[in-house]
Amino acid sequence: MFYLTFLLFGAICIGQIQLGQPVKFKVNEDGHRPSVYPIKYRVCGWEIFARYLAICHIRQRRRKRSIEADIITDKDTANSYFNRVKRGSGRFNIVEECCLEGCIPEEIREYCP
């Protein structure tokens, strides 16, 4: 209890939390104590992809493709780019982390190549 109170007081002092708004902290993936950092944002759809590109410092480049080049990929291959192995069993994906739960930049960075 003292630890959590200390974290909240510290976050208020450094200006990360605005008074009057509920504060949410990420719970570590093993289900134990909350992380030090409050949730920064909740993003969905194209916004996830834009943050991914910015945080991972990936630049989109236009390339000339041959007419025979297959620009369509199957759903499983496309989704595999945004998956990472979850500690324990199962998988997390970036949509679950950032859209449903809210995320911090460090979590998006885990998906960088």
Swiss-Prot record:
User: Which cysteines share a disulfide bond?
Assistant: C44-C99, C56-C112, C98-C103
Q: Which residues form the propeptide?
A: 23-42, 62-87
According to the UniProt entry, where is the signal peptide? 1-22
Quote the InterPro entries the UniProt record gives: Insulin-like, Insulin-like_sf, Insulin_CS
Against Pfam families, the record matches this protein to: Insulin (PF00049)
Checking Gene3D superfamilies in the record gives: Insulin-like
Question: What's the family?
Answer: Belongs to the insulin family.
What is known about what this protein does?
Insulin decreases blood glucose concentration. May have evolved to activate insulin receptors (INSR) in vertebrates. Molecular docking studies reveals unique interaction with the human insulin receptor. In vivo, insulin-like peptide injection reduces blood glucose levels in two models of zebrafish diabetes (streptozotocin- and glucose-induced). Also shorter swimming distance of zebrafish larvae, an effect which is not observed with human insulin.
Q: What is this protein called?
A: Insulin-like peptide 02
